[in-house]
Amino acid sequence: MKKFAMLMLYLVLVFALAACAGTDTTPQGSVSDTVTVTDMKGEVAIPANPQRIVDVAGLTEELLILDMKVIASANTSMFDGVSVPKHLATLFAERGIEVVGNYSGASSTGDLNLEKIAELKPDLIIMNIRHEKVYEQLAAIAPTVMIDDDISYVNWRGRFKQLGQWFDKEAAVEKWLADYDAKAAELAARIRDMIGDETFAVFEANSVHFGSYYIYRSGGPGELVYDELKLTPSAGVPENVWGEVVDAEYFSLIDADHIFFFSDDGRAGDTGNLAVWKNMKAVKAGNVYFGINEDQYNMAFTAMGKELYLEKLANAILNHGDVE
């Protein structure tokens, strides 16, 4: 009887060990899983649940919204390509996110810091076509995926949705976009109740070519004003374009009731002395809302920034003040 009991105990132990050996102890969606996705280069295998993402595609805000683990980013200032934008500074500090260049190519060096990227030992690199020249070098460091990119940043929703597809987070993306659209609709209704169908134009004093201006339509602040807040474009605002570079004489074509005007210091400067500026309807009525170039460049093109800047633009109108 004793021998039989010992034999049974032995068999139980053998089967238990065999079961443990045959069981996959890696949880579903673990860091060791990979998924094949389609990007601008074709098909590529990437981690399904990456733990050390280096983003040089300008998608850090979207990745953080999706609670992805970003260790380094190129979401730096569109002006100097080095400093962290004000609305991201706390997040970067809290999460220890390193800076490795600028996603738009605006860095003063013109390049990504490949050496630093390699030192960080990422398990995934997300890039855009602006850095295509270093694709092979990035791919040698870690699996590298290239987001579909229209260069002009108008397709920010499409890029966000592509991230959701890659990482099985489509529902989270759709929820964020629905909340964003609801907020935009609420602000648009408040503005409409106050000013009705009065018209708008969005100008930027060009920081590079002195004496010229951007007039926006579908890009950045133009998208926020016309497409999200549903405000009416003035006569003279171009259609079906990101924006256009114009000179001061173009002001004579604008018949806007309200103007957003962005410049490096947030004032009209020498533009305010021009007769053609003084003759515009919005200027005469005192309906000019001034904003700072760096702020709108850093906030009006990516998800978190858009949500914040949308409210800033709306508040400028509702409070009849500047974009602050």
PLM features: what roles do these ranges have?
Residues 21-24:
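Bacterial signal peptide processing site
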Residues 78-83, 131-133, 148-162, 197-223, ...:
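Extracytoplasmic ligand-binding site segments that recognize negatively charged/polar headgroups
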Residues 134-208, 296-299, 303-324:
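Extracytoplasmic substrate-binding proteins
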Residues 114, 118-126, 143, 251, ...:
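Proline-aspartate-enriched helix->loop->beta-strand connector
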Residues 254-324:
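Structured C-terminal subdomain patch of bacterial secreted/periplasmic proteins
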Residues 52-54, 58-66, 174-230:
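Basic- and aromatic-lined ligand-binding clefts that recognize polyanionic substrates
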Residues 15-19:
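C-terminal motif of bacterial Sec signal peptides marking the signal peptidase cleavage site
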Residues 59-116:
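A short, structured surface patch at a secondary-structure boundary
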